[in-house]
Swiss-Prot record:
Its job: Catalyzes the isomerization between 2-isopropylmalate and 3-isopropylmalate, via the formation of 2-isopropylmaleate.
Pathway(s) served: Amino-acid biosynthesis; L-leucine biosynthesis; L-leucine from 3-methyl-2-oxobutanoate: step 2/4
The reaction(s) this protein catalyses: (2R,3S)-3-isopropylmalate = (2S)-2-isopropylmalate
GO terms classed as biological process: L-leucine biosynthetic process
Organism name: Shigella dysenteriae serotype 1 (strain Sd197)
Binding-site residues, [4Fe-4S] cluster: C347, C407, C410
Protein known as: 3-isopropylmalate dehydratase large subunit
Length: 466
């Protein structure tokens, strides 16, 4: 029987499946951070259980770390306690930890791939909703809750029901300057923020194959923003070339054997999907969200939509509420909307290619008066590479703030946040009410678009910036 990539990944990891019961899956990699793990480790301690396979668990600090200092006390008592607990727990249970002073420290979904912890064909979990990022490698990766974190630590398994399957095909080639962020925002604009609910999405088509691994990570990172359980891109030569030589990747003959297996991780011809969505890449322009969910998105050259234009009464009501929160009026050109802050970072867009794209726009320009612009690399290695390439100097000379790695303003758990009423062009993944700070107004964009907003003071089409 012909199988989809998701079905192959799921079936090869079933440890046990009783009739009419939820299958038990083996978990190859477990990524841990300071926010969703303390209670899980406490649960192990209370029952006298060890971590079953500590060599398959990797920890880092990211969610509430300061991006201005490596001082563990910088972001308040709760952050300090969570980080101290992670240090204690990793030491006690034998888990590898990339702490604030480790050169590999960074956002968990940046650290995993760059260290070769993430590999094709794996099951990967983390107590974080954007674990879908790792699906870019042809791995089944999804976020879990704290009680499930404890279950994986204790057993290296997890009960998981089968999801429905969705194919999203982006046909043709994207225009110059159109990034993975624009593609995924256009997809979510078409499906809506709940269009993928109950599904695992496989992204395919020429425009997807053309993406680098970093672009594919951006794409899969936001699968969750259309309601999907996970996102997948089938592994190919781009994948294998990225993985080769990384710290935890197989070496020598083991790598060759792995590639031979990884090449089988494709959807079979004739396999059927429950849902199919198709987009034309050449029709996608630079995208900007205008509302309070990622599906409320338009082209940078469009006007703010009129809620009255929505046929669905639920969508109409959501649009009215979103415009009121965002302080926007229907019919205004998006390019006339001024911004207060810019955030370039997050597990969506903080890798070296993202920083290069932003620096290309920033070079030789200045941040507009009254705008605060932050650039937060996704990890220590990304920061080091950017500095080796001189990107930090480009940003600093343009008036951007060059920060230490962490999740930062994506979710405002540290000191990087919006004040009430402030408007931000952000490369992150969520524009919910209050996501970047109480009363803050978030517009999701690509790194180049964020840099363009920083230097012009408003949203601008990067295709017009020479």
């Amino acid at each position: 029987m012909a199988k989809t990539l998701y079905e192959k990944l799921f079936d090869t990891h079933v440890v046990y499946e009783a009739e009419n019961e939820t299958p038990l899956l083996y978990i190859d990699r477990h990524l841990v951070h300071e926010v969703t793990s303390p209670q899980a480790f406490d649960g192990l301690r209370a029952h006298g259980r060890p971590v079953r396979q500590p060599g398959k668990t990797f920890a880092t600090m990211d969610h509430n770390v300061s991006t201005q200092t490596k001082d563990i006390n910088a972001c308040g008592e709760m952050a300090r306690i969570q980080m101290q607990e992670l240090i204690k727990n990793c030491k006690e249970f034998g888990v590898e930890l990339y702490d604030l002073n480790h050169p590999y420290q960074g956002i968990v979904h940046v650290m995993g791939p760059e260290q070769g912890v993430t590999l094709p064909g794996m099951t990967i979990v983390c107590g974080d909703s954007h674990t879908a990022t790792h699906g870019a490698f042809g791995a089944l990766a999804f976020g879990i809750g704290t009680s499930e974190v404890e279950h994986v630590l204790a057993t290296q398994t997890l009960k998981q029901g089968r999801a429905k399957t969705m194919k999203i095909e982006v046909q043709g080639k994207a225009a110059p300057g159109i990034t993975a962020k624009d593609i995924v925002l256009a997809i979510i604009g078409k499906t809506g923020s709940a269009g993928g609910t109950g599904h695992v999405v496989e992204f395919c088509g020429e425009a997807i194959r053309d993406l680098s691994m970093e672009g594919r990570m951006t794409l899969c990172n936001m699968a969750i923003e259309m309601g999907a359980k996970a996102g997948l891109v089938a592994p190919d030569e781009t994948t294998f070339n990225y993985v080769k030589g990384r710290l935890h990747a197989p070496k020598g003959k083991d790598f060759d054997d792995a590639v031979a297996y990884w090449k089988t991780l494709q959807t079979d011809e004739g396999a059927t999907f429950d849902t199919v969505v198709t987009l034309q890449a050449e029709e996608i322009s630079p995208q900007v969200t205008w509302g309070t969910n990622p599906g409320q998105v338009i082209s940078v050259n469009d006007n703010i939509p009129d809620p009255a234009s929505f046929a669905d009464p639920v969508e109409r009501a959501l649009a009215e509420k979103a415009l009121a929160y965002m302080g926007l009026k229907p019919g205004i050109p998006l390019t006339e909307v001024a911004i207060d802050k810019v955030f370039i970072g997050s597990c969506t867009n903080s890798r070296i290619e993202d920083l290069r794209a932003a620096a290309e726009i920033a070079k030789g320009r200045k941040v507009a008066p009254g705008v605060q612009a932050l650039v937060v690399p996704g990890s220590g290695p990304v920061k080091a590479q950017a500095e080796a390439e001189g990107l930090d100097k480009i940003f600093i000379e343009a008036g951007f703030e060059w920060r230490l790695p962490g999740c930062s303003m994506c979710l405002a758990m540290n000191n990087d946040r919006l004040n009430p009423g402030e408007r931000c062009a952000s490369t992150s993944n969520r524009n919910f009410e209050g996501r970047q700070g109480r009363g803050g107004r978030t517009h999701l964009v690509s790194p180049a678009m964020a840099a363009a907003a920083a230097v012009t003071g408003h949203f601008a089409d990067i295709r017009n910036i020479k």
